[in-house]
């Protein structure tokens, strides 16, 4: 079977709280690292989340 085009990634908060989201991304359309603003419930604000590897 062919390997899927989507990889599982972890989006980790840049606020230093340790909070993270998991999602998938298409590695062909977006080969660079993803950075997106999302809500961090620990600091109760919208902060930037950056892509890290799932261990």
Swiss-Prot record:
GO cellular component, one term: cytosolic large ribosomal subunit
Gene Ontology terms: biological process: translation
GO molecular function terms attached to this record: structural constituent of ribosome
Entries under InterPro entries matching the protein: Ribosomal_bL33, Ribosomal_bL33_CS, Ribosomal_bL33_sf, Ribosomal_zn-bd
Cysteine-cysteine disulfides: none
Alphabetic keyword roster: Ribonucleoprotein, Ribosomal protein
PROSITE patterns according to UniProt: RIBOSOMAL_L33 (PS00582)
Pfam family, one: Ribosomal_L33
Recorded family membership: Belongs to the bacterial ribosomal protein bL33 family.
HAMAP family tied to this protein: Ribosomal_bL33
PANTHER family to which the protein is assigned, alphabetical: 54S RIBOSOMAL PROTEIN L39, MITOCHONDRIAL, LARGE RIBOSOMAL SUBUNIT PROTEIN BL33M
Name listed for the protein in its UniProt record: Large ribosomal subunit protein bL33
Organism annotation: Burkholderia cenocepacia (strain ATCC BAA-245 / DSM 16553 / LMG 16656 / NCTC 13227 / J2315 / CF5610)
């Amino acid at each position: 079977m062919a390997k899927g085009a989507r990889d599982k990634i972890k989006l980790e908060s840049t606020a230093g709280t340790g909070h993270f989201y998991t999602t998938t991304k298409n590695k062909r359309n977006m080969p660079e690292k993803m950075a997106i603003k999302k809500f961090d419930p620990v600091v109760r604000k919208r902060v930037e989340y950056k892509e890290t590897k799932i261990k």
